Amino acid sequence: MTNSLPLDEIICQLQESWQNLPDQRKANNNKQYEVSDAALSAYSVFFMQSSSFLAHQRDIHKRKGKENVSTLFGVKKIPGDNQIRNLLDPIKPDHFHADFKWVHKKLAENGCLATFLDYQNTYLVALDGVNFHSSEKIHCDNCSHRQDRAGTTHYYHNAIIPVLVKPDSQHVISLCPEFIVPQDGHEKQDCERAAVKRWLLQHHGDYQPHQVTFLGDDLYANNPLCKLIEESYEQFFVFVCKPTSHTTLYEQLASSTKIETRQERYWNGRYGEIWSYRFVNKLPLRSGDDALLVNWLELT
């Protein structure tokens, strides 16, 4: 059994899968570029050591007589940056979800996915928002926006990028992203928490029969979201919980007589450390009768 998944095998799968991507252009005989070639060209950017897609291809062609994208990714005719955007922007991200699941299926078959199980036989999924576009001028209908104190409007694109992680490893496995974009029928702007809820709705059962422990910062330590994870989807979470945003919890903590402590010695590879733990169970995440009771842990 091997834990590798060759790039050639992935590219072959993507070539086949992306032949079925929707083409928003009107039917005619003068189409210069295929949507699948645009998708493969965009995918190839992740493997380049150049800030310019076309400049890199021209340099390779000049030195070796054949473009890198054609050789490695099987692109028949290489579109430029603008053509790639025009062809791919109208395509909904959902069309690419099956490709993520194909990769995960292959990683499960070759044993790689099993190496990410923790000591409780659950997967660890880190949740985080990523900003991948910001401008005061360039914007589209899918942009979020905010105004600063000077009244300047800032436009930006964010997405939730969940990844499968494991302790003491620098490697992660990317999961399907969820983009933070205006939602039909909603007047308020989209946000990270709403995007995470949509992601959970679609993907919470992807790794059954194994359960998932979700990891995240203070933003996710929110009563409705935590209840959704624990009660509706029967999964686990470990979220940062700051005193400034969880005053009720820390007031209860300050008056608690049930705080337990523990110390352990740990060798970090260079010198010894003493890890000090403080923990207590069943503290309310917020005020109110419907507050979720959570376990609190501090490590210093």
Q: Residue spans of the language-model regions?
A:
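Short, conserved catalytic/metal-binding motifs centered on acidic residues
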Residues: 41, 56, 80, 84, ...
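Contiguous, well-ordered alpha-helical segments that form the cores/surfaces of helical PPI scaffolds
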Residues: 39-44, 163, 198, 224
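Gly/serine-rich nucleotide phosphate-binding loop at the start of the catalytic core
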Residues: 1-79
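Short, structured patches in soluble enzyme cores that scaffold and shape functional sites
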Residues: 131, 164-166, 177-181, 218, ...
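An anionic, glycine-rich sequence signature occurring as long contiguous blocks
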Residues: 240-300
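Active-site-proximal, Lys/Arg-enriched surface segment
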Residues: 85-169
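Electropositive, glycine- and tryptophan-enriched low-complexity nucleic-acid-binding patches
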Residues: 147-211
